[in-house]
């Protein structure tokens, strides 16, 4: 008789052992209830935060260097592609943005890959992870997560609809480092919640992605034609670009 094998989810095992709960639907409901109660996003100032991000991109694209300096237009950041110490992957992303933005210095790479999103949340919410802050609620054992990923996209990396303070215990369920039903259900609920609360901003993002799509496609075509970059590196880079510059289903 052939032995039957089971699918074993480490998260379900954890909840069963510590809380006596092994029903995935119930676990999923409780996870989301806890998340809604304990997570913090840019809410009251979401319009200002979104307007500021888009204005800075537009100014860096269209205004003179003197105007940018005089008006103190702050930098616009994206996450590094691949290994931070890899000059080839760094150069790829920089070349992409110079192509997209007609050789204008619009973006900078976030040296820590999370400093800019943290600063954005710190600026536009009443919460911070800075333990020495004197005028905000200080969060411990929280981290910054991206609801939709898209961390190579300057319109998304620090967008108010994409950054959230989550308790570290919940971070695995956002889907970046784990798989399975619980992760899928939690990620879906988080994204649907954000879509319902930031719908107009996401619509604007989608329109921008539609406008940029021809340039993204042409860049990929031209850089592939050069033939001087490793095939595996290009394949991964194109995959990351597709994920970061795709529209969000509403």
Regions from the language model: what does each represent?
Residues 156-158, 173-216:
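Polybasic, low-complexity binding patches
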Residues 164-168, 187-190:
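Short, surface-exposed linear patches
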Residues 209-250:
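C-terminal, well-folded lobe of enzymatic/effector domains
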Residues 1-112, 181-187:
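Mixed-charge, low-complexity interaction segments
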Residues 105-135:
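A broadly used, surface-exposed interaction patch
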